[in-house]
Structures are given as C-alpha cells and as structure tokens.
A protein has these predicted regions:
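Extracytoplasmic catalytic/substrate-binding loops of multi-pass membrane glycan-assembly enzymes
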Residues: 44-57, 69-81, 91-94, 232
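Short acidic/glycine- and proline-prone juxtamembrane loop motifs at membrane-interface regions
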Residues: 136-147, 302
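Transmembrane alpha-helix segments characteristic
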Residues: 25, 29-33, 131, 176, ...
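Loop-to-helix entry region of an early transmembrane alpha helix in multi-pass inner-membrane enzymes
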Residues: 76-80, 90-106, 140, 303
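Perimembrane helix-loop-helix junctions
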Residues: 10, 163, 188-215, 241-242, ...
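Hydrophobic, aromatic-rich transmembrane alpha-helices
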Residues: 194-198, 256-280, 284-288, 333
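Membrane-lumen/periplasm interface segments of specific transmembrane helices
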Residues: 37-38, 55, 206-268, 289-293, ...
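Transmembrane-helix motifs of polytopic, lipid-linked glycan transferases
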Residues: 98-118, 156
C-alpha cells in the first residue's frame, strides 16, 4: 500500500513537472485556439472584399481563364493560389476569404518555434503573442490581400537561415523569391536578413545555394508575368519615388501602430547586452532597414507597410525587458560600450588605410 502511494505521488510529481516545463507551450496553444476563433468570427462577417482584394480575385480569374490581367502590376502569388483553389472548387470568393489568415497564423507558429529554440518559451510566447494581436496585422489578415502571405515567407526565410543545413539555405532562397512573388517591395526584408546571416556564418557555399534558390523563383515569376501581361511592373510610378529626407510618419504614429511596447525599442538598440548575442543581429537590421526604407518614400505612407517587420519590433521590445531584468540600465556602461565600439572602428580603419600627402586615402 505504501509503495502504491509512493508511486502515485511520484507519478503526480512527474506530471506536474512536465506541465511546469511546457506551461508556455500550453498557454501558446490556448492563445492560438482563441486567435483562430477570432479570425473565424471576423472573417465570417465579411460580405464583400476590400478594393485590393477584389483585384486579386479578378487577377485570379484572369489567370484561370487565360484573359488579360486587370492590374498587371500586382504581385501574382496570392492570385495563383486562389486560381489553384478555384480550379478544384469552382470560382467563389467566399471559399478563399480566409486564405490570408491561414498564412498569418502559420507565420506565428514558425516564429514561436524559432524563438523558443533560441530564446526560450517565455520570450517566444511574448514576441509571438504581441505580433499576432497587432491591430494592423489582424485587420489586414482578415481580408483578401498579401500582407499575411508576405509575412509568412519573411518569417519562414528567417527560420531557414537560422539553420546551418545547406538544404535549408537553398529553401531560404526560394522563400525570398516567394516573398517577392507575394509583395514585390517586401523582398528587401528577407534580403537584409540573408545578408546579416551570411556575414555571421561566413560560408560561401550556403550563400551561393541561397542565391540560386532565389534567382530560380524570381526569374520564374518575372517570366510568367511578362508572358501573361507583355510587361513587368512592380508598382505604380507614383509609389516608386524615394528621397533621403526620411519622413517621420512611422515614428509619429508608432504608438498607434505598435503600442507602448515601441518605447522599449530604443532601449534595446542602445543596451550593450543586445549585441552580445549574434542571433539578435538579424532582427536589429530587419527593423532599422525596413523602417528607413518605408520612411524614404516621398508620398505613400500606410500603416499596413509596417506589418512585415512587426515581429522585429516586438522582438526588440521583449529583448529590452530581458536586458533590464538581467543587467539593469547602466548609463555609464552603455556610453562606454558605444565609445569603445566607435574608437575600435576608427582604429581599424586607420590601420587598414593611410592618408597620403595628396589628400587621398590609400591602402
């Protein structure tokens, strides 16, 4: 009897230990079930597609029926997927109105799995939950469009590049190309991640594999669109004007877009602990380059342009909290870190180059 009670007690302790170990995974699953229900509820209320969604549906019809594209400058991937579904089910926008939500939900799962492996379950859940409940992301993911689709391939690219397997880097190249096919200008974001990871790994063979995979997909997309439309255009002319005078639009509206969490981003960028872990570098570059790119547009500023780099914003926000908890905020150490970093860069530059009497730098 005593032995049975001991075994039961031990078994109960093991169950509790497992529940404690996987508590954030359980919370994540519960959160995701709630999220899926919210998507289902809001999508079921839609009676007509938004303007952009209507044209993606028209383009899908044109691809399916071999007619000229209504708007040939729109990225083709979402229309190809819809056309593929319609070839089986018949044409009905109701069948595909929840399509983008599937990609957004999948992006969150991939993000959680990646961050859980490298940063822990609590960190992963925090970043993923903040990303998934982001207002712009949720709203546009309930529509027929490309925001969630492009986010999915950006996150999937990040996932593949964080692995050192050659096959994963080739797949990363393909997902970069699919990001291009999803939403043309968003290709910049996985490219930035790719460049950062390439500099960290320093493995030319992996880089070449990624480039080959990327070119394979991009050339296929360009050729197919060109053969269909007789031309290839990535955007309207009015949306392609850029300037070095960066607009403050996204910074001014940052609290409306990302909430109070955005206030933590500068802390993460300035804190020296952020730069100890090379895993963070891709997220830093992802955020900075994306923000500067969209701020450099001379006229077209939209909240939905921030969706694809929202994970980077919340990653840095949560990282700032982690830095404060573990190291605190020490202004002197932060200033010293940046002072030493700048001095180190200047010294390495001076060692590499010499200034000749003619006023030119030379090696």
């Amino acid at each position: 009897m005593a032995l049975e009670n001991y075994n039961k007690s031990r078994k109960n302790k093991n169950i509790l230990a497992r529940l404690s170990r996987y508590k954030f995974d359980i919370i994540f699953i519960i959160f995701y079930l709630f999220l899926i229900y919210q998507y289902y509820y809001h999508i079921s209320l839609l009676y007509v597609p938004i303007h952009d969604g209507a044209y993606y549906l028209l383009n899908a019809h044109d691809w399916l029926t071999n007619k000229p594209l209504d708007e040939f400058y729109r990225p083709p991937l979402i229309s190809w997927i819809i056309a593929g579904i319609w070839s089986i089910t018949g044409e009905s926008w109701v069948i595909v109105k929840g399509l983008q939500a599937i990609f957004t939900i999948s992006a969150g799962i991939i993000l959680y799995v990646l961050l859980r492996k490298h940063k822990g379950a609590m960190f992963a859940f925090s970043v993923t939950a903040l990303t998934m409940v982001s207002g712009p992301l949720f709203f546009f993911s309930t529509q027929i469009g490309t925001e969630g689709l492009a986010l999915f391939f950006v996150v999937l690219t990040l996932y593949f590049l964080k692995n050192q397997k050659a096959s994963h880097w080739f797949l990363a190249g393909m997902t970069i190309g699919l990001t291009f096919a999803s939403r043309y200008p968003i290709i910049l974001q996985p490219l930035v991640i790719f460049i950062v990871e390439s500099l960290i790994t320093k493995k030319p063979k992996l880089v070449i594999r990624t480039i080959l995979g990327m070119l394979l997909v991009i050339l296929t997309v360009v050729i197919m669109v060109y053969l269909k439309a007789g031309t290839f255009q990535t955007a309207l002319a009015k949306d392609t004007a850029f300037t070095l005078l960066f607009s403050p639009y996204y910074l001014i509206n940052s609290l409306d877009i990302w909430g109070l969490a955005f206030l933590l981003v500068p802390i993460a960028l300035l804190h020296e602990r952020t730069y100890r872990d090379k895993f963070n570098y891709a997220f830093i570059a992802w955020f900075i380059v994306s923000l500067l790119f969209w701020s450099a547009n001379s006229s077209n500023f939209q909240v939905r342009f921030t969706i694809q780099y929202t994970p980077a914003v919340y990653f840095l926000s949560v990282l700032a909290i982690e830095n404060i908890i573990k190291d605190g905020i020490t202004i002197n150490n932060t200033i010293l870190f940046w002072y030493n970093s700048i001095n180190s860069y200047i010294k390495s530059f001076k060692d590499k180059y010499k200034y000749n009497i003619l006023g030119h730098w030379e090696k």
